[in-house]
């Protein structure tokens, strides 16, 4: 020890890691016994110091960080800029969230680093610093919360809240910050409670699966090894950690000299020699093969050499050591510890941000520009990227600073720029981040104000959202919310304000405004009426323009009609809001007034179908035949009713009309067999009959006979449904959520139909009736206390559980002479006399012979005859009457056909609300394509608002593609030079874009009239070429080179001028924004603008006209204003007209703060009036939306504050704190497939199993395939588990994990390919056992590798006692008894259960009988070890060991590739 006295005296503090290193070196040098004495003295010293020092912790010890103020200010400045960008629409919401999270996270991290250095420099003996940084109590992040800032938090859903907590716990939190931080705290408390139990259970399962693994033998004799080499991307630290304590599997040579022999254990000295060798010759050095538990050849134990050194002392593990239990506990224990360490943020954003380089002082920055090249940061800001390490100099007044910036960093300043102190000058790329787990998150953006939605690019009507109002964005674009709120007066008779007037915003509060705004959206009741009621009467010009691909029908919605259930005369359109028209879809119907039932009431409709395939039978046959035919024709035939229903992706239509037969029998319980046979003879149907209402057993009925009337079952909903709903499926119509289709196959034609009056009263059960069942009454007879009949005729009463039904059939009882001649259920035409009837006079009307039971009553037959009203069906009307000739002489290409159908079911009682009309026949317009049903058309209601008028269009696009989209024309076609202070969108004419010409000619849009909502409309002017001319935008002398040639091929519609041909004359707006001004000057016929040097003609007689974005012309009548939108307008005065024409056009959107003229624009918005000396901007807010975002709502739809606008889908990093990490570890151990297991291991094993036998051929293939598969998966699993633990700074030796993974992967499953005599297919056996059995039997056993979870592995051991004490006791024991299993009691648990000596430690030796040669080998190795340990130098260790800086340790484990590559010597 004498030479040791000359050593350097170290005077420095020692922390937890330093203490660990000291102890390990003491053990290496002095051995276990001596070290324990030293440590005992250390402990006494520590307690003594603690007593004398008596550290106390006061609030003064919490030193705040001086740099916090400007750091937070800096971050706030950046956030403010971000907010502004977002407000201008330059970035979208997700980007804003991401960047603000990043800004604040970087600030918080920088503060943390500052805090460390601040403590170290100012007060190294500070109690807070001492406790937290020595590892005694608390950790860095907790101290950071105390004296730094709490930083970002997550909400309960795990989403980031982008409002950071700027204060720390020493300063105290504001109320908002307190509430935000409560989320994380609560999550932490819950996690602690839940996860601690999980961690304990994990430990139990881990110990269970490996409890029988102990060191039983010196050497298993394996010749395999796993190669380790720093070339695989391992850091030297990790390399050293992997090697120390292992045993070499092969000799190691440097050059020709062997420096280490096989089976030698590796110490720190040997590792340092390896590292120096690798540094000297990185590519020539051979990989090092080591033995691991994976390479051990034993089945249920492990040998000393494959395990390596004991974790407690630097010698080989002793025989009889229970290494399995040690491994299970080493892995499980950190889990319990880590769950107790509740995270301060509850799953906050961790990692992944770049480190920042800040300038040391004010000065001018300089660097070599050749070494950098321009690029953009991930947020799109310009920066320089440097390839190699770059030295940057900052020249302050007296000092020259040099800052080194590592390669691949981004430089955020320019050369020769003046930088301030602590300004960020560069961003260092972070290494591989620990966040490989991504999750997809939706973020909804809500509107911040009321207004209308506009968008400025194509928006797809995505096919999967056909019925919704969701649209996909194909490319990044802006959505604009044009501000304005709706003020609807109840009566639109008079308004003080003229069109375009400025209204005083305070005015509306004084008088009450009835707000119909919500209910009055266009969807109000599902039916819209065209405003041309006289379409069918005369050939009026319905301005529905027929185009090849689209037509528009103007609609009008009457508010006062909401209360009416029946639509008034005219065409009604029945379309879902975003409906799809297929072939044969009905899209409109017309109710012919001739088929309108009078207001009196209800009855039955009778008709006969004539199918298209059938020949039509003429009625010019003889009388008898005609009698038969008639009966045939007018009887309902159920077999024609039973059509197939088409089921497609919208689901099958519900069958609302149940069959009657069962119901009636069950309800009234009367046997109908007798009656049924008679029906069979006559070929009629069950519906035509219903049993008597009374009890059939009554004698009176037997005596006199009762009458049966044909009625279908009464479904309760039949009486109160509005008439539109009873368009039946039985005509071959199929309903799909509002669209109806014909199936042509089953279409029937009807010549005429009949209406028979009939009345139904549904009365409460308790009401007393004034009339008897089966009696005949007259009109207006009193039925109950307060109801009277409207018809005369026969009364039937049916009592049900909840109510009483009373029916009155109009008509008379008629007594025929002979029963055989009269057939029930037929209709008799008026001209024919009835042979057998007593009356001989001709009847004017048709009659209907009610179906009857023929019961003899005093030798008389009787039949019930009812009057019927006949309606003839005429042929379908010609389409030419529907649509006038197209004014633009386009060919008729819209395929519509007209179909009439009866809207009531045959023989079904139609009951309507009294005093309303009911419609019998409905004429439908059906979309008719020649091709098959591939074609679809989208129908949408377009609501166009031009200033104060709201017009609704039904737009039907008959496009070939499934995705149709509306194009709004804001494309830039800039031409000519622009002065510097101008906007870069030059003279875009918003209605003309060169790029769209070709496609427009294919999909023409129609121009339809826009109808005023209050029943007055101006006629639409179709402008021909003589009416309009193009305004040249660049005709003034300032831009001589920029004159554009007119494109002669542009269709006339495209070349309206920037103001839509109409330029209003100058109005004098005063600077007061609330002044009411009036636009009353009429336009002259010719308006001459001196600056433009060009005259152009204006439509005369109109006060104002505008073409809106869809190129539709609208004319305003400024005397009537129904729904004034209170527009927030903003005036911009500019000097002369010529200056602006190059820049501004109507409908253009302008962002805030754009410098158009000498003044800045103070609000963003849309230009919507342009006058000679000023223009008006309607305030609007832009929202940027990215590709693939979903837009909610329609173009021009009114949105209210808080309505959802856009939904973004973006990926965000999942934070990997241990509360999520522990379940990951467990899932890997349990071999469950989870998303974040990057390559799913089970799938990988399948692949290996399949491919390798194919490559190598069968008998060998299985053996090698299974081995390689297992080896591959083992290494991958070890790396994954280590990654989770290392990300938490927990260090577990690989060999513990290896022992457990070895158990999980050691089984193979016998496959069915080759039958063997030993194992049954599907049986799980150990891999080594399978190999040995194959060798012993001289036949190949086919098997494949399998990945068991730890639970399944615990239930597949050799000991059934251990399995039974783990789980499923009864099942395990019963199986074991049936199989006659034997337990050899090799493990610990079996022996503990049975009370035997456990076979480890001292109880181990009686099992082992060493052979003498074994002993010699053992002593030789002992000598080798002694020699090697004496070679180690204590000081050598002290200097060479990796530095104790704890920050470095965290960066060592980010290896992306697996550190091991297996090697096999076979």
UniProtKB/Swiss-Prot annotation:
Q: Where is the composition biased (Acidic residues)?
A: 621-631, 639-651, 707-725
GO CC terms of this entry: chloroplast; DNA-directed RNA polymerase complex; mitochondrion
Q: Which keywords belong to this entry?
A: Chloroplast, DNA-directed RNA polymerase, Metal-binding, Nucleotidyltransferase, Plastid, Transcription, Transferase, Zinc
Biological processes, Gene Ontology terms: DNA-templated transcription
Q: Which reaction does it catalyse?
A: RNA(n) + a ribonucleoside 5'-triphosphate = RNA(n+1) + diphosphate
Q: Name one GO molecular function term.
A: DNA binding
Q: CDD domains annotated for this entry?
A: RNAP_beta'_C
**Required co-factors:** Zn(2+)
Query: Which protein, by its recorded name, is this?
Result: DNA-directed RNA polymerase subunit beta''
Annotated source species? Agrostis stolonifera (Creeping bentgrass)
């Amino acid at each position: 020890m004498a030479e040791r006295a000359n050593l350097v005296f170290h005077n420095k503090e020692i922390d937890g890691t330093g203490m660990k290193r000291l102890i390990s070196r003491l053990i290496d040098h002095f051995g276990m016994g001596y070290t324990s004495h030293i440590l005992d003295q250390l402990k006494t010293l520590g307690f003594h110091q603690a007593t004398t020092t008596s550290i106390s912790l006061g609030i003064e010890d919490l030193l705040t960080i001086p740099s916090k103020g400007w750091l937070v200010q800096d971050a706030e400045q950046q956030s403010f800029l971000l907010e502004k960008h977002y407000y201008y629409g330059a970035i979208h919401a997700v980007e804003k969230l991401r960047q603000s999270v990043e800004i604040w996270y970087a600030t918080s991290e920088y503060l943390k680093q500052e805090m460390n250095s601040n403590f170290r420099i100012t007060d190294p003996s500070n109690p807070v610093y001492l406790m937290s940084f020595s590892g005694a109590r608390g950790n860095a992040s907790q101290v950071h919360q105390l004296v730094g800032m709490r930083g970002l938090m997550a909400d309960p859903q795990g989403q980031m809240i982008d409002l950071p907590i700027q204060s720390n716990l020493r300063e105290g939190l504001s109320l908002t910050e307190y509430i935000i931080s409560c989320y994380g705290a609560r999550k932490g408390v819950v996690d602690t409670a839940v996860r601690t139990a999980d961690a304990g259970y994990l430990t139990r399962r881990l110990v269970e699966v490996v409890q029988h693994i102990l060191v039983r033998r010196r050497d298993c004799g394996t010749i395999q090894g796993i190669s380790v080499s720093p070339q695989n991307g391992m850091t030297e630290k990790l390399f050293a950690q992997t090697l120390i304590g292992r045993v070499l599997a092969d000799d190691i040579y440097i050059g020709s000299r062997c420096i280490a022999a096989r089976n030698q254990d590796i110490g720190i000295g040997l590792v340092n020699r390896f590292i120096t060798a690798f540094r000297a010759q990185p590519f020539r050095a051979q990989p090092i093969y080591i033995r691991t538990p994976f390479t051990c050849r034993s089945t249920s134990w492990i040998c000393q050499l494959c395990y390596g050194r004991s974790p407690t002392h630097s010698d080989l593990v002793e025989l009889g050591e229970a290494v399995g239990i040690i491994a299970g506990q080493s892995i499980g224990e950190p889990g319990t510890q880590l769950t107790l360490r509740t995270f301060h943020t509850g799953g906050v954003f961790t990692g992944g941000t770049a480190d920042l380089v800040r300038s040391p002082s004010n000065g001018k920055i300089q660097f070599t520009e050749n070494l950098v090249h321009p690029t953009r940061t991930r947020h799109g800001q310009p920066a320089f990227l440097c390839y190699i390490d770059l030295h940057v100099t900052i020249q302050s007044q007296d000092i020259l600073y040099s800052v080194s910036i590592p390669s691949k960093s981004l430089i955020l300043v320019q050369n020769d720029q003046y930088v301030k102190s602590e300004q960020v000058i560069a961003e260092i790329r972070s290494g591989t981040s620990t966040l490989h787990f991504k999750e997809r998150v939706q973020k909804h953006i809500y509107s911040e104000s009321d207004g209308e939605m506009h968008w400025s690019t194509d928006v797809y009507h995505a096919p999967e959202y056909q019925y919704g109002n969701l649209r996909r964005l194909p490319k990044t674009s802006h959505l604009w919310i044009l501000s304005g709120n709706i003020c609807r007066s109840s009566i639109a008779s008079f308004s003080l304000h003229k069109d375009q007037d400025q209204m005083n915003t305070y005015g509306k509060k004084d008088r009450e405004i009835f707000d119909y705004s919500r209910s009055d959206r266009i969807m109000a009741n599902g039916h819209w009426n065209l405003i041309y009621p006289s379409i069918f009467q005369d050939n009026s010009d319905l301005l529905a323009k027929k185009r090849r691909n689209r037509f528009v029908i103007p609609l009008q919605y009457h508010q006062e009609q909401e209360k009416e259930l029946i639509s008034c005369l005219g065409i009604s359109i029945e379309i879902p809001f975003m409906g799809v028209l297929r072939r044969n879809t009905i899209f409109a119907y017309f109710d012919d007034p001739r088929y309108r039932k009078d207001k009196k009431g209800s009855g039955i409709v009778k008709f006969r179908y004539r199918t298209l395939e059938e020949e039509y039978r003429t009625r010019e046959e003889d009388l008898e035949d005609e009698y038969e035919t008639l009966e045939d024709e007018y009887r309902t035939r159920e077999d024609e009713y039973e059509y197939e229903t088409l089921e497609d992706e919208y689901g099958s239509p519900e069958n609302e009309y149940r069959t009657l037969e069962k119901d009636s029998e069950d309800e009234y319980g009367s046997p109908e067999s007798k009656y049924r046979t008679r029906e069979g003879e006559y070929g009629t149907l069950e519906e035509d009959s219903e049993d008597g209402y009374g009890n059939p057993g009554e004698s009176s009925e037997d005596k006199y006979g009762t009458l049966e009337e044909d009625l279908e079952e009464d479904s309760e909903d039949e009486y109160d449904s509005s008439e539109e709903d009873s368009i039946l499926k039985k005509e071959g119509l199929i309903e799909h959520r509002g669209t109806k289709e014909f199936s042509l196959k089953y279409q029937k034609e009807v010549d005429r139909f009949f209406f028979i009056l009939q009345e139904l009263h549904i009365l409460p059960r308790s009401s007393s009736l004034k009339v008897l069942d089966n009696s005949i009454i007259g009109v207006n007879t009193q039925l109950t206390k307060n109801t009277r009949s409207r018809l005369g005729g026969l009364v039937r009463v049916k009592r049900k559980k909840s109510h009483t039904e009373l029916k009155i059939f109009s008509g008379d009882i008629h007594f025929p002479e002979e029963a055989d001649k009269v057939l029930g259920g037929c209709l008799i035409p008026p001209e024919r006399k009835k042979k057998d009837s007593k009356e001989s006079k001709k009847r004017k009307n048709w009659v209907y012979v009610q179906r009857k039971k023929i019961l003899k009553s005093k030798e008389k037959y009787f039949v019930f005859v009812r009057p019927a009203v006949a309606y003839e069906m005429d042929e379908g009307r010609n389409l030419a009457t529907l649509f006038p000739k197209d004014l633009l002489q386009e060919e008729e290409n819209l395929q519509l056909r007209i179909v009439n159908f009866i809207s009531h079911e045959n023989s079904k009682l139609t009951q309507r609300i009294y005093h309303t009309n009911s419609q019998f026949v409905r004429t439908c317009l059906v979309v008719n394509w020649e091709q098959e049903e591939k074609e679809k058309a989208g129908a949408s209601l377009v609501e166009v608002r031009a200033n104060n008028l709201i017009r609704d269009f039904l737009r039907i696009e008959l496009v070939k593609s499934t995705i149709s989209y509306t194009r709004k024309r804001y494309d830039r076609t800039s031409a000519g030079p622009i002065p510097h202070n101008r906007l870069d969108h030059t003279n875009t004419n918003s209605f003309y874009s060169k790029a769209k010409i070709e496609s427009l000619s294919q999909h023409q849009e129609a121009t339809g009239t826009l109808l005023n909502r209050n029943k007055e409309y101006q006629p639409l002017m179709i402008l021909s070429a003589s009416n309009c001319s193009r305004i040249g935008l660049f005709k003034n002398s300032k831009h001589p080179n920029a004159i554009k040639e007119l494109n002669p091929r542009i269709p006339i519609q495209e070349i309206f001028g920037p103001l839509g041909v109409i330029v209003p004359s100058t109005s004098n707006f005063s600077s007061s924004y609330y002044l009411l001004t009036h636009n009353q000057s009429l336009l002259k016929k010719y308006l001459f603008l001196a600056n433009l040097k060009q005259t152009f003609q204006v439509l005369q007689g109109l006060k104002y006209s505008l073409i809106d974005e869809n190129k539709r012309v609208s004319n305003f009548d400024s005397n009537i204003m129904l729904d004034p939108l209170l527009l927030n307008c903003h005036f911009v005065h500019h000097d002369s007209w010529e200056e602006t024409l190059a820049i501004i056009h109507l409908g253009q959107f302008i962002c805030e703060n754009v410098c158009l003229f000498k003044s800045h624009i103070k609000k963003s918005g849309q230009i919507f009036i342009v006058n000679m000396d000023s223009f008006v901007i309607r305030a609007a807010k832009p929202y940027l939306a990215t590709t693939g975002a979903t837009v909610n709502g329609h173009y021009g739809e009114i949105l209210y504050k808080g309505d959802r606008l856009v939904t973004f889908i973006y990926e965000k990093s999942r934070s990997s704190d241990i509360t999520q990490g522990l379940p990951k570890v467990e899932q890997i151990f349990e071999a469950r497939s989870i998303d974040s297991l990057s390559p799913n291991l089970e799938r990988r094993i399948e692949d290996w199993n399949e491919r390798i036998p194919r490559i190598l051929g069968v008998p060998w293939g299985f053996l090698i395939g299974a081995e390689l598969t297992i080896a591959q998966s083992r290494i991958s699993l070890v790396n994954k588990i280590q990654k989770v633990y290392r990300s938490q700074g927990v260090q577990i030796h690989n060999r513990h994990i290896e022992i457990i993974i070895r158990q999980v992967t050691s089984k193979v499953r016998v496959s069915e390919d080759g039958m063997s005599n030993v194992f049954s297919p599907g049986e799980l056996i150990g891999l080594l056992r399978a190999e040995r059995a194959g060798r012993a039997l001289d036949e190949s056993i086919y098997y494949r590798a399998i990945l068991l979870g730890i639970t399944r592995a615990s239930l597949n051991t050799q000991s059934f006692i251990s399995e039974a004490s783990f789980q499923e006791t009864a099942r395990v024991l019963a199986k074991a008894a049936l199989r006659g299993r034997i337990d050899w009691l090799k493990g610990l648990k079996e022996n503990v259960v049975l009370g035997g000596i456990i076979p480890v430690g001292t109880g181990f030796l009686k099992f082992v009988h060493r052979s003498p040669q074994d002993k010699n080998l053992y002593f030789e190795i002992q000598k080798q070890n002694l020699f090697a340990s004496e070679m180690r130098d204590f000081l050598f260790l002290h200097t060479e060991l990796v530095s104790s800086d704890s920050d470095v340790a965290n960066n060592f484990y980010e290896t992306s590739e697996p550190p091991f590559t297996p090697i096999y010597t076979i």
